[in-house]
């Protein structure tokens, strides 16, 4: 038994308005917004309203691009119009405009009154020439806006560049592949593979060269067999701090190599069927040596896999990311790097401790606190500076040595210090003390890792700026 399909209130279509006359009635903010959309579509816009109205005066760009008519509305103004928009603050005038336009068969939109409209403006995700329209048929504009915001985070901003590249190669692909199924398979491999990732990260020239090689056949087999490595910074722990690009690559990877510092909440966002490999990196207990990790990245990519190398924080700040991509470059494996919010920045922000402040600190220094054999050749004398913030990564175990050396080189024992444990996560802890007593406090309270240590006068600002507590 067949089920009758529900009819639509509006048909979503795209209209060519290049060089065509359009009339907007009203001088409100809504009229200005609709005018901007029509101008983006290449229309010639006449606006009926007061040229001195506040909304128009605040939109100088729109005023310079349109003709403002300070006359009362008359149906004769509709001559030669492709579309009409009624956006005045008079319900009676808007209804009059709608009736006159519909009597002449001219598409009309009455703002916030879909029942009087023959067309409505959708919410738009702009990746020109790719445009995605979202509409609730005028019934739930807030819901439409929420849906658009979600889609904005899922569609890379480079989609427009990818569409331009596809159009550029359309004729070449048609000449190379005679059957539509061959062309479809080719474009699917291109748009879901390395070429699209190159475009998304701004390397369009490289993508163009790769497309030429694929079509010529000279390197088609090598391109097909070689995957790519994504070196992605996962940030300090809170999944909401991931970048859009990081999230997209996490969702398309075939295999992920992750460190101990990557939170379970972030791992949950990785593609469900991706193979997961824990490469560890706890203090003195590396699940895999760095050289084996480097070799594994190369091997997996050469198997044609999309390999996600997921690191806590930022891969280029005490993350050994440079070593890993150096070997990838030697092996000729394509890769891209996605920065993450480094632990110093994320933990400081979530603790209410600005790393720099005009009254307290004009510089900040990141230092590794991962000491080997209880010794360190750090330039301690350089750390003892006025108006400077020190941030030690991986310094929990070495905290007694760090405190002792800084005091020995001239830093006051009363210098404010904060230790942030599991920063940006729901169970974040912040322990504040002085350089001379912090090690004892940590021992008494059994603070768990991972931690960030912040030293300097900026720590005193936490009492007023602690927004997470």
Swiss-Prot record:
Highest taxon listed in the record's lineage: Bacteria
UniProt-annotated stretches for the region Precorrin-2 dehydrogenase /sirohydrochlorin ferrochelatase: 1-211
Keywords recorded for this protein, A-Z: Cobalamin biosynthesis, Lyase, Methyltransferase, Multifunctional enzyme, NAD, Oxidoreductase, Phosphoprotein, Porphyrin biosynthesis, S-adenosyl-L-methionine, Transferase
Catalyzed reactions per annotation: uroporphyrinogen III + 2 S-adenosyl-L-methionine = precorrin-2 + 2 S-adenosyl-L-homocysteine + H(+); precorrin-2 + NAD(+) = sirohydrochlorin + NADH + 2 H(+); siroheme + 2 H(+) = sirohydrochlorin + Fe(2+)
Residue ranges of the region described as Uroporphyrinogen-III C-methyltransferase: 227-469
Coiled coil: none
Active site feature: 259 (proton acceptor), 281 (proton donor)
PTM-bearing positions, type Phosphoserine: 136
Pathway given in the UniProt record: Cofactor biosynthesis; adenosylcobalamin biosynthesis; precorrin-2 from uroporphyrinogen III: step 1/1; Cofactor biosynthesis; adenosylcobalamin biosynthesis; sirohydrochlorin from precorrin-2: step 1/1; Porphyrin-containing compound metabolism; siroheme biosynthesis; precorrin-2 from uroporphyrinogen III: step 1/1; Porphyrin-containing compound metabolism; siroheme biosynthesis; siroheme from sirohydrochlorin: step 1/1
GO molecular function, one term: precorrin-2 dehydrogenase activity
Binding of S-adenosyl-L-methionine, residues: 236, 312-314, 317, 342-343, 394, 423
Keyword Electron transport: no
Any Pfam family matching the protein: CysG_dimeriser
Binding site for NAD(+): 29-30, 50-51
EC number: 2.1.1.107, 1.3.1.76, 4.99.1.4
GO process annotations (BP): cobalamin biosynthetic process; methylation; siroheme biosynthetic process
Record's keyword annotation contains Heme: no
Function in brief: Then it catalyzes the NAD-dependent ring dehydrogenation of precorrin-2 to yield sirohydrochlorin. Finally, it catalyzes the ferrochelation of sirohydrochlorin to yield siroheme.
Sequence similarity: In the N-terminal section; belongs to the precorrin-2 dehydrogenase / sirohydrochlorin ferrochelatase family. In the C-terminal section; belongs to the precorrin methyltransferase family.
PANTHER family registered for this protein in UniProt: SIROHEME SYNTHASE, SIROHEME SYNTHASE-RELATED
HAMAP family named among the record's database cross-references: Siroheme_synth
The name this protein goes by in its record: Siroheme synthase
Organism, as annotated: Hahella chejuensis (strain KCTC 2396)
Gene name as annotated: cysG
